[in-house]
Amino acid sequence: MNADYIDMLKCLNKAGVDYILVGGWAVNMYGCIRATVDLDIWILADSENAKKVYAAVAEFGAPVSEMKPEEFAEYGMIFQIGVAPCRVDIISKISGVSYADAATRAVSKTIDGIPVRIISLEDLIANKKASGRAKDMADVEVLEGFRK
């Protein structure tokens, strides 16, 4: 994991943000190694967490001066920092699973010494199936092999 991603995770943890790691990095955490151009951070979309997210991304150095913290509480919000292949995507919605349900099943892991919560294997598969993109369906095929 690159230094910017590590710094972002540290900022999120320091601010006490309620988040779950999803997307390509979550896929990689289950042993299905594939290239990814971003770090997908799924946040709880509520006003209290939005303030924490705002503080974390500001500390990270993201351009938030034109934003209001409550924008991070909007369901369906996407906030991108940087450009691929080193982009951070902060999102408040994914397909196929609700945050409330996913949060109860999220798996605690450590990445480069940083504690993170990763979307559960079952929820990751549900999300990938719901998205329907070719690369996600390829992930599903491999991830389903880890169910056994």
Residue ranges and their predicted role:
Residues 1-148:
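Compositionally biased terminal segments of proteins
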